[in-house]
UniProtKB/Swiss-Prot annotation:
One of its GO terms (biological process) is regulation of DNA-templated transcription. One of its GO terms (molecular function) is DNA binding. Pfam families: HTH_6, SIS. It comes from Haemophilus influenzae (strain ATCC 51907 / DSM 11121 / KW20 / Rd). Residues 129-269 form the SIS domain. This is Uncharacterized HTH-type transcriptional regulator HI_0143. Disulfide bonds: none annotated.
Length: 288
């Protein structure tokens, strides 16, 4: 069953993997969630012009036993949201907005996407990923486009606390590195959409060579998750014009920073010493 209070976010994370008829149902629910809590199965099916069996299958696809359980959980979520549905609309940038208003809207957008990420994350899987990373001989982060930039940022942070880590955004380098991984290594694939062919193929190669594989994505059932041992789902709550800079990067960085914090937790002294050691060699090169 989907996490309580998380029905709408779960639908969003599964959206790209849904069939055409399921997307039709999802669109209506995301647009008018109150419809489900106020109507019966037959009434909703008639409104959507789909069969009752199709609606029940949709509920099972997103993790519920049937329509009744789905309706109950969605009703609970709506009752506790306190009109939070308005928050996404309030982050849209309008032509009349001044710089302060835009700044406040971006602040709200960041808060929205982090809240959604916390709701979507399977924290047990996250903790397992941290355990695997602590034991890993090497860690490789793979991602193209903006996800590649995020991978480089994570590489920098992990290297500073003593991990053997690398990152790549070039597909040829990604494939070659993945082919050389072993069962002692961990491969992390970053793809917000989940449909990056290069990243999905890299994770497949890494898996075939025995590495532990992790996918960080917004799309729970997507190509990048197919060969992943662990799937970490990030949020995507953003306005139409906010794009990757707010939605994708903030959500991905939030998850990676959470992993970093858990890796350091309980080993603060060792992490601090290692970080200072790596910092010192950088400071030595600065112009005095």
């Amino acid at each position: 069953m989907a996490k309580s209070g998380n029905v709408l976010n779960k639908i969003g994370s599964l959206y790209q993997s849904l069939t055409k008829s399921e997307k039709k149902i999802a669109d209506t629910i995301l647009r008018s969630p109150d419809l489900v809590s106020q109507c019966s199965l037959s009434e909703i099916a008639k409104h959507l012009q789909v069969g009752e069996a199709t609606l029940v299958r949709f509920c099972r696809t997103i993790g519920f036993k049937g329509f009744s359980e789905f309706k109950l959980e969605l009703s609970i979520e709506l009752a506790t949201k306190d009109n939070q549905d308005e928050s996404i609309l309030e982050t849209e940038i309008m032509p009349s907005d001044d710089s302060l208003t835009i700044a406040q809207k971006l602040q709200t957008a960041v808060a929205n996407v982090m809240e959604e990420t916390i709701n979507l994350l399977d924290l047990k899987q996250l903790e397992e990923v941290v355990k695997v990373l602590k034991k890993a001989r090497r860690i490789f982060l793979f991602g193209v486009g903006s996800s590649g930039v995020t991978a480089e940022d994570a590489k920098n942070k992990l290297m500073r606390i003593g991990f053997q880590v690398d990152a790549s955004g070039n597909n040829h380098f990604m494939y070659m590195q993945a082919a050389l991984l072993t069962s002692s290594d961990v491969a992390i694939g970053l793809s917000h959409s989940g449909y990056s062919a290069e990243t999905a193929h890299t994770i497949k190669i890494a898996k075939q060579n025995g590495a532990t594989t992790v996918a960080l994505t917004h799309s729970l059932r997507s190509p990048v998750t197919e060969y992943a041992d662990y799937v970490l789902v990030n949020g995507n709550k953003q306005g139409k014009l906010q794009g990757d800079s707010i939605g994708t990067k903030i959500a991905q960085l939030f998850v990676l920073d959470l992993i970093y914090a858990l890796l350091v937790q309980g080993e603060e002294d060792i992490a601090a010493q290692t970080k200072q050691k790596t910092l010192n060699v950088i400071l030595e090169q600065r112009i005095k």
